[in-house]
Amino acid sequence: MAYDKSIAAFEEAYKVIPGGVDSPVRAFSGVEGTPPFIERGEGAYLFDIDGNRYIDYVQSWGPLIFGHTDADIEASVIDSVKKGLSFGAPTTVETELAEEIVLMFESIDKVRFVSSGTEAVMSAIRLARGATGRDNILKFTGCYHGHSDSLLVQAGSGLATFGTPSSPGVPADLTKHTLLGTYNDIESVEKCFADSPEGIACVIIEPIAGNMGLVPADETFLQQLRALCDAHGTLLIFDEVMSGFRASLKGAQGITTVKPDMVTLGKVIGAGMPVGAFGAGAETMAQLSPEGPVYQAGTLSGNPVAMAAGLTSLRKLKANPAIYVELGNKAKKLVEGLKRAADSVNVPMVTDVRGSMFGFFFSDKPVKNFADAMENDQKLFAKFHKGMLDRGIYLACSSFETGFISTAITDEMIDETVKAAYETLKEIKG
């Protein structure tokens, strides 16, 4: 494939945008390449400015569960835009979307909308601190919860790609209140509690980690985490910005028996529009302004266009829950095919699937935490990514990112993807 126009566009962007992109992972630094500049999407496909077509397994990093330009979502957005882009005032569509979310998540009585997943998590952390009167929070190495200061400590996602344990500009006085546990290791959590006599406001976790690759939390680990939080009066937050409505209709909470105290959401609930949300029981949410003393606000929170897109998306999912069986079967078919391709050239690979989310590592052992994920062959992944891209397969440009299946992806497209994997790995191994 030719990428001449994208290369030129990247050079132009670099002159006026830091790194040429508005989110670091998009720069393709993790795979030592140049990002295709996308012109449009249609169904399962992306089209770049050079005229190349790709089967898209990134799905705008998760939101597009129905693929690009879904007719129903597109119609709801157009209808909403005709009424106005933003009002900075309450609308009934906010309430309707909130009602759908509350119905689907037992742990949520009330929900508030914001404009991004980062905002959702930042606000949830503030609410947890306000509700408990404690400063310390606990997160897990490799879990990414957006780029708010308190949580840029040994995060995954782009920070893993760039090998940065935290970010300059984040005060040490702030991060001293962020404690670190090891994912799927309850002893590390017990030690954090033992070392914090002043208490911990909240424990935040991706119940299905998606930013150190796809790494689900063990059920026993989540149960032990729930028990520890209960024993210490600590709020348990599930960050389901990625897994919400992706792992199942009820997110990770449709798979695990463990129920959190608070939940953060994003991605699918906006169907590709900028949105985030956080919710909890009525008593906790009553601490939030204007009812309570914990302040949170946003000019574009509950934007009517985003709400309309999200409402249509969730109602489509709710009307046909069998979609998740279909998506899960396709995800399994894909990773099984990738594994066969790797086996054919004696390349070790481990895979996992949770609903419409999938992941793979070039590794010879199961991945249970960030340290395991870091042992995957990143150089091989970079070569594999380039070969797949050249064959029209658009995968996440980091071995630490999760892939996604949309309803627009067909069995024939998966067969084409697996064929490309065979060709790419055979080419790499010579």
From Swiss-Prot:
UniProt xrefs under SUPFAM superfamilies: PLP-dependent transferases
Matches recorded under Pfam families: Aminotran_3 (PF00202)
Keywords: Cytoplasm, Isomerase, Porphyrin biosynthesis, Pyridoxal phosphate
A GO cellular component annotation in the UniProt record: cytoplasm
Domain of life: Bacteria
Modified-residue entries (N6-(pyridoxal phosphate)lysine), positions: K267
Cofactor: pyridoxal 5'-phosphate
EC number: 5.4.3.8
Metabolic or biological pathway: Porphyrin-containing compound metabolism; protoporphyrin-IX biosynthesis; 5-aminolevulinate from L-glutamyl-tRNA(Glu): step 2/2
Catalytic activity from the UniProt record: (S)-4-amino-5-oxopentanoate = 5-aminolevulinate
Protein localization: Cytoplasm
Molecular-function annotations in GO: glutamate-1-semialdehyde 2,1-aminomutase activity; pyridoxal phosphate binding; transaminase activity
Spans through the membrane: none
Keyword Signal listed: no
Record flagged with keyword Transcription regulation: no
GO biological process: protoporphyrinogen IX biosynthetic process
Homology family: Belongs to the class-III pyridoxal-phosphate-dependent aminotransferase family. HemL subfamily.
Assembly mode: Homodimer.
Name recorded for this polypeptide: Glutamate-1-semialdehyde 2,1-aminomutase
Originating organism: Sulfurovum sp. (strain NBC37-1)
Gene that this sequence comes from: hemL
